[in-house]
Amino acid sequence: MWFCIDLGANVFKEARALAGKKNRRVLQYILGLNIFKRELIPPCKDPDPSQIQILLKNYILKNVSTVFTYYCQ
């Protein structure tokens, strides 16, 4: 999930509604924070699986610390 958010995910309303239907209250709350920064890394425009693997291998969480700041206070 964090990887998708950092790459510029933009279906937060839909994901939040789905989390509510699945009774995932914590996830629903996190998706409703509206604090995620999409400019942290450029969007992935190349659907090549090998390029995605490289991104995942070198991936460092960026938005998760923001969530913990808001959610764990």
UniProtKB/Swiss-Prot annotation:
It comes from the Viruses. Pfam families: ASFV_360. InterPro entries: ASFV_MGF360 (IPR002595). One of its GO terms (biological process) is taxis. Belongs to the asfivirus DP63R family. This is Uncharacterized protein DP63R. It comes from African swine fever virus (isolate Tick/Malawi/Lil 20-1/1983).
